């Protein structure tokens, strides 16, 4: 099954983007190749850009506190494992404490690093980070992999409370919904929301169906068109019946 997630609010859209970027930093930063570390650094710059667009830290702290209060209401419930509940509460409290301990604007320490900001500025220009443009960066890329990883860790670590908070919120959001089997006719699925509240949709499709969902949704209606995965020609609707799994997620 291939899973597609569609945010229904700007806040969840931002969290999904940051979650994806943090995963890419972990993937490319864990490599030893200079070009992978180059991608990791550029991705850190993307995190800096996305995280600065919203009052992210406050939103995460407030959401974690809301979830903590919900979990506290389950105490002394015989159907809930006290050990699992205590573990979840501890994780949320640790993440909240770490977020509250972050001083100043997210990533300000990066903005104050003139060398990094010089690379960021050149990276905005197509082909702007060639060795003749940034010889000091070329030198850095030719240092030992362990030294580069040490630097990358130092640049990303102060933002790990953001990453950890996002991981908790998104895990809770994803686990909140109940999958429903649905069927699209002639490659199209439509649903009237009728007061249904959701912050994110998840569509899961068997690989064998070989289609890509184009999702549009608002508080009134949900529309999904299942397209044939073209890489050259213009995508076309797969005009056949398609079975898929639909989940409405909300906190």
UniProtKB/Swiss-Prot annotation:
Localization annotation: Cytoplasm
Alphabetical UniProt keywords: Cell cycle, Cell division, Cytoplasm, Septation
GO cellular component: cell division site; cytoplasm
Principal location: cytoplasm
Example GO BP: FtsZ-dependent cytokinesis
Record NCBIfam families: PRK05287.1-4
Assembly and interaction partners: Interacts with FtsZ.
Function field: Cell division factor that enhances FtsZ-ring assembly. Directly interacts with FtsZ and promotes bundling of FtsZ protofilaments, with a reduction in FtsZ GTPase activity.
Family (UniProt): Belongs to the ZapD family.
Record-given protein name: Cell division protein ZapD
Species this chain originates from: Azoarcus sp. (strain BH72)
